[in-house]
């Protein structure tokens, strides 16, 4: 079988997980797909089958993974599906939304990795996932509103994707209903306008580029959610009224220090660290610590949990299904080496929340 030949031929990649780890992630997520999406599940089952039966398909995936030295297996798996979805959406082909069986996907994956091989390989070698869901900013918005008592704020959003977050804060764009059994104040904080004097949204690609817009769209929706695209486009039109948020195009893995140190009252990193190599996460977190002021807030929202054995203080996981593994963490400028767990979300769509381990401690300081 192809997978046996792959494993037999593998050697160490300088401490990086081998391609067999990518295969494992495909199989794990075929059983527990992101968002519980049946189209993604059947796609990943088809990938597992083709890796076993089609040497050319397996070789294509393996070589693409091994040419991205800082890419984690989970990021590669996510990127693969987003690349497939991008190609399908760009061609206005949405039949895959209803695919519920690996047999539906197998001929399509073979076709795409043959006819669209160059395009798909370029995606796998050069792009990063850029999921942008405004609802994911509910945790950061609630934290900032609760802890800043209406004072004037300068906020940075590192890895902003489509730049929804800060513009939504400025315009007080409402969030969808959140089910919570513990904190009525959550809705009060979400409805409270922030006194945003200046916002800086940072990403390595410009969200106003038409091709980037298509890519963000492909990354931001599960197939079963594509019916919501029109609502998001309407929100984007509303966000164009923003006047206080500017965009900076910069690769956070290689920061240029163009941003002044200690300048911001809050820095947000929403769902972007999980896809990076551990050493790159440290670089990004160090930049966040550099630009926040000593009394400022660093807010990380991601698929992670506290782990003091990790250099970052957080262990990142593939908790994309409903197990409350998507969490909101707080660090401060004067205690930047420590994270407090504030909120635990049922999943990355943020419609159900529980108090985090450190919620009482953090919110004892709420205004």
Task: Give the ranges of each region predicted by the language model.
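Class I SAM-dependent methyltransferase Rossmann-like catalytic core
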Residues: 60-152, 164-173
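Class I (Rossmann-like) S-adenosyl-L-methionine-dependent methyltransferase catalytic domain
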Residues: 164, 213-217, 227-259, 299-367
């Amino acid at each position: 079988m192809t997978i046996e030949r792959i494993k037999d031929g593998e050697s160490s990649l300088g401490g990086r997980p081998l391609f067999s780890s990518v295969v494992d992630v495909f199989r794990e997520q075929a059983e527990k797909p992101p968002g519980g999406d049946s189209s993604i599940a059947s796609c990943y089952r088809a990938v597992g089958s083709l890796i076993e039966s089609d040497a050319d398909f397996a070789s294509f995936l393996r070589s693409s993974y091994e040419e991205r030295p800082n890419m984690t297996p989970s990021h590669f798996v996510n990127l693969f599906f987003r690349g497939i979805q991008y190609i399908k959406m760009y061609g206005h082909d949405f039949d895959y939304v209803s695919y519920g069986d690996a047999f539906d996907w197998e001929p399509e994956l073979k076709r795409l990795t043959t006819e669209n091989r160059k395009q798909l390989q370029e995606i796998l070698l050069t792009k990063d996932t850029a999921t942008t869901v405004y609802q994911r900013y509910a945790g950061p918005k609630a934290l900032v509103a609760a802890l800043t008592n209406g004072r004037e704020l300068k906020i940075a959003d590192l890895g902003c994707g489509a730049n929804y977050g800060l513009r939504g804060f400025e315009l007080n764009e409402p969030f969808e209903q959140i089910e919570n059994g513990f904190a009525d104040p959550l809705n009060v904080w979400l409805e409270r306008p922030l006194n945003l004097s200046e916002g800086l949204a940072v990403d390595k690609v410009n969200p106003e580029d038409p091709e980037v817009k298509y890519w963000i769209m492909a990354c931001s929706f599960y197939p079963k959610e594509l019916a919501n695209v029109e609502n998001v486009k309407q929100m984007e039109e509303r966000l164009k009224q923003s006047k206080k948020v500017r965009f900076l195009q910069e690769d956070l893995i290689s920061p240029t220090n163009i941003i002044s140190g200690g300048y911001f009252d809050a820095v947000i990193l929403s769902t972007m660290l999980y896809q990076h190599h551990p050493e790159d996460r440290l670089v990004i977190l160090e930049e966040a610590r550099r630009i926040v002021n000593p009394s400022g807030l660093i807010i990380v929202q991601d698929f992670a949990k506290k782990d003091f054995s990790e250099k970052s203080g957080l262990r990142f996981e593939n908790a994309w299904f409903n197990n409350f593994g998507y969490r909101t963490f707080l660090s401060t400028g004067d205690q930047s080496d420590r994270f407090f767990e504030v909120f635990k979300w049922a999943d990355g769509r943020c419609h159900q929340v529980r108090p985090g381990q450190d919620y009482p401690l953090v919110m004892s300081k709420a205004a």
